Swiss-Prot record:
Lineage, uppermost ranks: Bacteria, Bacillati, Actinomycetota, Actinomycetes, Mycobacteriales
One annotated GO molecular function: 2-C-methyl-D-erythritol 4-phosphate cytidylyltransferase activity
Function comment: Catalyzes the formation of 4-diphosphocytidyl-2-C-methyl-D-erythritol from CTP and 2-C-methyl-D-erythritol 4-phosphate (MEP).
Family: Belongs to the IspD/TarI cytidylyltransferase family. IspD subfamily.
Annotated site (Positions MEP for the nucleophilic attack): R157, K215
Cross-referenced Pfam families: IspD (PF01128)
Record-level GO BP terms: isopentenyl diphosphate biosynthetic process, methylerythritol 4-phosphate pathway
Enzyme class: transferase
Native organism: Mycobacterium bovis (strain ATCC BAA-935 / AF2122/97)
Pathway stated in the Swiss-Prot or TrEMBL entry: Isoprenoid biosynthesis; isopentenyl diphosphate biosynthesis via DXP pathway; isopentenyl diphosphate from 1-deoxy-D-xylulose 5-phosphate: step 2/6
Name of protein: 2-C-methyl-D-erythritol 4-phosphate cytidylyltransferase
Domain of life: Bacteria
Catalytic activity: 2-C-methyl-D-erythritol 4-phosphate + CTP + H(+) = 4-CDP-2-C-methyl-D-erythritol + diphosphate
Annotated site (Transition state stabilizer): R20, K27
Amino acid sequence: MVREAGEVVAIVPAAGSGERLAVGVPKAFYQLDGQTLIERAVDGLLDSGVVDTVVVAVPADRTDEARQILGHRAMIVAGGSNRTDTVNLALAVLSGTAEPEFVLVHDAARALTPPALVARVVEALRDGYAAVVPVLPLSDTIKAVDANGVVLGTPERAGLRAVQTPQGFTTDLLLRSYQRGSLDLPAAEYTDDASLVEHIGGQVQVVDGDPLAFKITTKLDLLLAQAIVRG
């Protein structure tokens, strides 16, 4: 495969505790059938053939362990107290290097993401879109509710999508979004990177996601992932 011009860097924020999964270690370090989630996520990015460099942000006390697991496959940095801070710290690593053309941000918990999905996001970036997210249509009916549990309405499902990762951006747009967004609202207000782009008025394009790019968050998700990798 001949790689096109313009470097692509993938950031994997993996500094969270993963308390909902309750497996006794940070979620990214949980071994799924003999291989950690972070390892599977990084391998999926590299196997796509469109990612040049991977930067992984982990808890400060796990950096040595991450280096042992990933070896030369990724740069390791200490993450922050929340996802937004963690991505910011990973972006800071890029400031000392030649700026890549594109940056992907990918959840370690989406460890089974097919390489073809990664390539699809990068292809859309190279086609001229500045921000790209993979999505899936919703199958469940969604209700908007208030703090007391009273239903306020039923959004039209046809216009809703479930968002996955990797999310891709031109480097300049992502840096501007983080610089501006981090000043305007608390980091916890942003649940994904595209939200920061939306906040500064940027346009986000969707591409087809993949059911295998589901996020391993609960024990049920873990059982599904185990069944998939064991065939």
